[in-house]
Amino acid sequence: MIKIADIKESLAGKTIAIDDVVTTYSNRESSHKAAWTYMLASQLTSIGLNAKVLTKQDNVHDFDVWMVALPMEFEGSYNLFGGANDEPAARIKRLLDYSGDVYCLNREMPNVGGFVESRLKSCSDNWKALDINRLGNICETIKTVDTSTDSTTFILGDSHSVSVFMPGANISRNDGKTLFGVMKEGMETYIPKGTEHLITYFGNIDIRHHLCRQSNPLESVKALVADYFKHLKALNINRIEVVKLLPIEFEGRRIPKTGWHKDAPFAGTQVERTQLMEVFNSEVDRLAEEYGFGVISWPSDWYDTHPELFAKKYMEKPGSVHLSREFYKYNFITNKENLSLKKTINSLF
């Protein structure tokens, strides 16, 4: 693995494409899956590089350098919703034809040739025509680039953490991680040495799946936040900011099975979880003042918005537990604070 700082000079003045070899990225701001890739582009542009996330309309051959961004949910293999047909075959062929430098962002480049071979039993003719051995050889030569910098600002959180990413900062996104779980492991195991400004964003998952299962949910949430602040204080970091939790969306919202726990999309009613969220956020405000920490809040009108409208307006489409990129704290294209957060919608009608 090489650090982005080690190759920054060689990339200066070059156009950089950020794209996967097999799958595509959407330019829709409501796409949470694409948001991580746009954040990677933000990391590169914030250090002066000319990087762009490609969509279906772009041609990677128009760019000097290709930075491969694997899908956010990638776990060693690709999901081909339409099968091994001509469309993904054409995308993979781009790697065979590409003449510029290729890197893989933050993760080891998978063997695309091996993946192609695994789908030969049911595929199109163009898929069969792909040079498996050459693909494998190319992938072996692709180096991994670590996009982290020497920034002293560090963001630690679950899958929601990308929504508070600050251009120029480093980030550790831990999908499915609860506040209870990260404290049990110890946040210090995640935080790099030299961190002077820590932003933490945990708790949405605890509210969604776990706290309503406790014998006394209200006391449990208060105890959880109290432990949270004691844990943060023990880290002895100069500046700490805690992100408040999002409003609780309506119960009819479709949640992908990846967001379920114990065969359920949530535990507790919308009203019960809203009460816990409000207590959590209230305790964050109270303890932040006591401990001298900062608080990162969401627009107050969101909490007065009808739960169904909140989901339809502010969350990822068509359904998930995440905020739409349109309402992240920063705009990843401009690297400036997001003015969309000033918009207000309060009524379902």
Give short role names for the model-derived ranges.
Residues A17-I18, T24-G48, P110-H197:
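Serine-esterase "nucleophile elbow" of acetyl-processing enzymes
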Residues M67-L80, E188-K222, L246-I255:
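Oxyanion-hole/transition-state-stabilizing segment in secreted/luminal serine hydrolases
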Residues T23-S30, F74-G82, S172-G181, I205-A226, ...:
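Surface-exposed cleft-lining segments at the edges of enzyme active sites
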Residues D6, A17, L40-Q43, I47-G48, ...:
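Extended catalytic core of nucleotide-activated donor transferases of GT-like folds
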Residues K128-T141, Q275-M277, D285-R286, G292, ...:
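Histidine-centered active-site loop/cap adjacent to the catalytic His
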Residues G252-P299, S320-Y330:
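Substrate-gating cap/lid alpha-helix
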Residues K3-L11, Q57-H61, I92-R94, T144-S151, ...:
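Short amphipathic alpha-helices and their capping/turn segments at secondary-structure boundaries
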Residues Y103-G114, Y201-D206, K233-R273, S300-T305:
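Active-site segments of SGNH/GDSL-like serine hydrolases
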